[in-house]
Amino acid sequence: MSRGTLFDKVWDLHTVATLPSGQTQLFIGLHLIHEVTSPQAFSMLRDRGLTVKFPGRTVATVDHIVPTENQARPFADSLAEEMIVTLERNCRENGIRFYNIGSGSQGIVHVIAPEQGLTQPGMTIACGDSHTSTHGAFGAIAFGIGTSQVRDVLASQTLALSKLKVRKIEVNGELQPGVYAKDVILHIIRKLGVKGGVGYAYEFAGSTFAAMSMEERMTVCNMAIEGGARCGYVNPDQITYDYLQGREFAPQGEAWDRAIAWWESLRSEADAEYDDVVVFDAAEIAPTVTWGITPGQGIGITETIPTPDSLLDEDRAVAAEAYSYMDLEPGAPLQGTKVDVCFIGSCTNGRLSDLREAAKVAQGRKVAAGIKAFVVPGSERVKQQAEAEGLDQIFTAAGFEWRQAGCSMCLAMNPDKLEGRQISASSSNRNFKGRQGSASGRTLLMSPAMVAAAAIAGEVTDVRNWLN
């Protein structure tokens, strides 16, 4: 029986059966696939003589392995080319909608689905990618799955899942200038830990989230997984509806009015029951940068790197590992740390509003000597919109490279990689060892505006000093 949260309502509406194991057989309303985790799933289908049950509920694109500097086919990387050819064939043979390079709609899977109106409140959404929680910004229940589960969704449009607990995370108050959605989620993960959300869905609530745009909410929900939560969501509201209205796959006419009435009914009740509630004050959140090897190892820009005696016992071992790997001293400031590469993009921060905020910092300034700085739009549509606004010219005039759409340096599956012990100021979502392509490369996570400021200064700096 529903406890009155959006999570419980959507879960119950999509429950096909309760399995003998106690798990729920859950219907999946939208399945997103890409070139990395889908080939084996299609092979398993063929091996078992199965077909895609509801091809109209699956949408595909290429993002992880595509180069962002030169996207001419065939790719120089023969494996990358083979993966895309395989996805093209699998989609063609199974009647699956596919957004390929040059279609005008290709991009990172978690960018293109919302911008086309595919992602809607009340949906269950699955994708073979960790950051599927992004779509929860719309009031959907969205989660990443493994390759065998991709197979299961293709074959049955359902998954066997254990129901999650629900934690309400309230942030109230107005964010300070120079503090962005990225800082909010990094602050939450810092306080609750990278394992704090294990077994939970996070409901993001409070006046701070109510004031956020959809793209800001997507940034927050995108990184719920980095705090251990399986998914994160925001209740749909007028901001959600205004974003969706008129988009290609959004309901139209009378169907639109019916949809809003239904979406409104899904919102968590005022007396909803949560497993626990955590409250934060927006005024306490500063521009935040990670110093270590997990997204939970973050500090406000004016703080110093924590010393072992200031940490909980369970955090000291990974902190010691981080001090050594990052070559940073406990008690030292992170501000002023020299950087080598500055990357703006990813499914966390590669949307139009992210590029606008970074461009405000870059405008009229120059990238510091010796810094490699580049901007990678999250989709072909974002790229087109940014160019229509002249953002590309602002970046290139400042010395940034302006690239094609793709996942880029968020992960080491394409030509955009760190080299050796380079330090990256990155707007992406993970700072694990080797994440950006070099086994010894170092990643500092921050907002796009902070990355732009680091590129200009040549070092980690407080973006508030760069805002006109």
Curated annotation (Swiss-Prot):
InterPro entries: 3-IsopropMal_deHydase_lsu, Acnase/IPM_dHydase_lsu_aba_1/3, Acoase/IPM_deHydtase_lsu_aba, Aconitase_4Fe-4S_BS, Aconitase_4Fe-4S_dom, IPM_dehydratase_rel_enz, IPMI_cat
Gene3D superfamilies xref list: Aconitase, domain 3
Cofactor note: Binds 1 [4Fe-4S] cluster per subunit.
EC number assigned by the record: 4.2.1.33
Keyword vocabulary terms for this entry: 4Fe-4S, Amino-acid biosynthesis, Branched-chain amino acid biosynthesis, Iron, Iron-sulfur, Leucine biosynthesis, Lyase, Metal-binding
Quaternary structure, from the entry: Heterodimer of LeuC and LeuD.
Family the entry assigns: Belongs to the aconitase/IPM isomerase family. LeuC type 1 subfamily.
Name recorded for this polypeptide: 3-isopropylmalate dehydratase large subunit
Naturally occurring in which organism (per UniProt): Synechococcus elongatus (strain ATCC 33912 / PCC 7942 / FACHB-805)
